[in-house]
Curated annotation (Swiss-Prot):
Gene that encodes the chain: Slc35b3
The organism of origin for this protein: Mus musculus
Subcellular location: Golgi apparatus membrane
Main location: Golgi
Name by which UniProt lists this protein: Adenosine 3'-phospho 5'-phosphosulfate transporter 2
Cited Pfam families: UAA
GO biological process: one example: 5'-adenylyl sulfate transmembrane transport
Membrane-topology annotation of the record: Multi-pass membrane protein
Catalysed reactions, as listed in the record: 3'-phosphoadenylyl sulfate(in) + adenosine 3',5'-bisphosphate(out) = 3'-phosphoadenylyl sulfate(out) + adenosine 3',5'-bisphosphate(in)
GO cellular component terms, semicolon-separated: Golgi membrane; mitochondrion; trans-Golgi network
Sugar attachment sites: N39, N222
InterPro entries: SCL35B1-4/HUT1 (IPR013657)
Length: 369
């Protein structure tokens, strides 16, 4: 605020900074959406949507392909935690580079909060990567689609929440779809192991918590995405490094990867890079068009990932995968619908019956004439 005094006329001029000027230095504009150095705000809404969708599909499809490709390397399956260690190292470097490109490099979120977020991030990504040593990739993706289940269970038992019929129906559809998909996998998959189901279930529980903690911390302290990535993944890197050192899991993993550096470290670099770029487009999609459209796009991406997994990697197939997957998709739709009932208006059963009766009457009248 600037104060200007004029002795001759004796008045005070007060100028209030604009909203853009009053913002934190690391945010250029309220409306600007910058992804990978490109300001999407200069384009039309349709172009922004197409760019974001293309980014999500391209980077995350490559991400999923590389993740399954790494675990298809003979002998790599026991080293899921080491892959997570390497992934956290790359994410920390990417976050540091992005943070250096901003004007404001101060850490805004307290260290204790980052220690909690890092622990949850380790649980989410480490357990998810390790589960691929026991599960088919499509089964893991289907489980990832069902984060609503642990979120609802936590809301009921911890916060005493009550959910509407659409939410309950969504959870039931997801649960039945998961059970059906898992039973199909256990019947035809030669390497099925319940350990993988337990690992991915624990990863889902951590993932259900981490989103709320991250959102609350970033809003409370006005932190940037690059700061969140740098500190949460660098602290998580230390956690995993200590864990692998204490369990003697670091030496064998390093020895194995040194024999095939291109198939391990090379793929891990591309895997981490595409994942880092992919999340940038998802965040841009949420900021411009909202969570409803973002969920729709990411769900389509996951469905495409499952299809490509069956095309590029040889694995047994049964039509139970299709029916159970459709149940999960129905659950996702019901979950999105329950949160956006004012935007999505479905016709009631009464209106549908009335419309059908009117059409029948019109056909009868036409036949009579």
């Amino acid at each position: 605020m600037d104060l200007k005094f004029n002795n001759s006329r004796k008045y005070v001029s007060i100028s209030v900074p604009s909203k853009t000027q009053a913002m934190s230095p690391h945010i250029k504009s309220v409306e600007d959406v910058v992804v990978l150095g490109v300001n999407l705000s200069k384009f039309s809404k349709l172009t922004q949507f197409l760019i974001c969708v293309a980014g999500v599909f391209v980077f995350y499809l490559i991400y999923g392909y590389l993740q399954e490709l790494i675990f298809s390397v003979e002998g790599f399956k026991p080293y899921g935690w080491y892959l997570t260690l390497v992934q956290f190292a790359f994410y920390s470097v990417f976050g540091l580079i992005e943070l250096q490109l901003t004007q404001d490099r101060r850490r805004r979120i307290p260290g204790k909060t980052y220690m909690l977020i890092a622990f949850l991030t380790v649980g989410t990504m480490g357990l998810s990567n390790t589960s691929l040593g026991y599960l088919n990739y499509p089964t893991q993706v289907i489980f990832k689609c069902c984060k609503l289940i642990p979120v609802m269970l936590g809301g009921v038992f911890i916060q005493g929440k009550r959910y509407n019929l659409a939410d309950v129906s969504a959870a039931v559809c997801m649960s039945l779809g998961l059970i059906w998909f898992t039973l199909a996998d256990s019947t035809i998959a030669p390497n099925f192991n319940l350990t993988g189901v337990m690992l991915i279930s624990l990863a889902l529980c951590a993932d259900a918590v981490i989103g709320n903690v991250q959102e609350k911390a970033m809003k409370l302290h006005n932190a940037s995405n690059s700061e969140m990535v740098l500190y949460s993944y660098s602290i998580g890197f230390v956690y995993i490094l200590l864990g692998l050192s204490c369990t003697s899991g670091l030496g064998p993993a390093v020895a194995f990867c040194s024999k095939n550096p291109v198939g391990t470290y090379g793929y891990a670099f591309l895997f981490s890079l595409t994942g880092y770029f992919g999340i940038s487009f998802v965040l841009a999609l949420i900021k411009i068009f909202g969570a409803l459209l973002a969920v729709t796009v990411t769900t389509g991406r996951k469905a495409m990932t499952v299809v490509l997994s069956f095309l590029f990697f040889a694995k047994p197939f049964t039509f139970q995968y299709i029916w159970s997957g459709l149940l999960v998709v129905l659950g996702i739709f019901l979950n999105v619908y329950s949160k956006n009932m004012d935007k999505i208006r479905l016709p009631s059963v009464y209106n549908m019956i009335k419309k059908a009766m009117d059409m029948k009457k019109s056909r009868t009248l036409a036949q009579t004439v």
